[in-house]
Amino acid sequence: MDKKVARIRRASRARHLMREQGATRLVVHRTPRHIYAQVIAPNGSEVLAAASTVEKVIKEQVKYTGNKEAAAVVGKIVAERALEKGIKAVAFDRSGFKYHGRVQSLADAAREAGLQF
């Protein structure tokens, strides 16, 4: 089993548990150059808030989009957008990625901005 397939299997197991609980999810996806975050409704069919390093607003704030500082900016902005919509508590869906580095920076920034995991 290769690395990508293993990550996708881990992610699907975690998502299954979150669906059973009926939780609003903060989903993170990362690539070597960018990081993306979305707040998804409990039914899984609607994106309630989103932010990523491909947005012009975020690109202007950071020098490079593939580091922890950029991930922290994305976490702060997605949390602010979720709070504007009245979402205070979410389940953190790391999409099978290790809770380390950019994924951890995004989560910490979202918590500091007011989201509860």
Swiss-Prot record:
Family: Belongs to the universal ribosomal protein uL18 family.
Entry GO MF terms: 5S rRNA binding; structural constituent of ribosome
Pfam families in alphabetical order: Ribosomal_L18p
Record keywords, A-Z: Ribonucleoprotein, Ribosomal protein, RNA-binding, rRNA-binding
Protein name according to UniProt: Large ribosomal subunit protein uL18
Source organism per UniProt: Glaesserella parasuis serovar 5 (strain SH0165)
Native organism taxonomy: Bacteria, Pseudomonadati, Pseudomonadota, Gammaproteobacteria, Pasteurellales
Any single GO BP term: translation
Gene: rplR
Top-rank taxon, per record: Bacteria
InterPro entries (UniProt xref): Ribosomal_uL18_bac-type (IPR004389), Ribosomal_uL18_bac/euk (IPR005484)
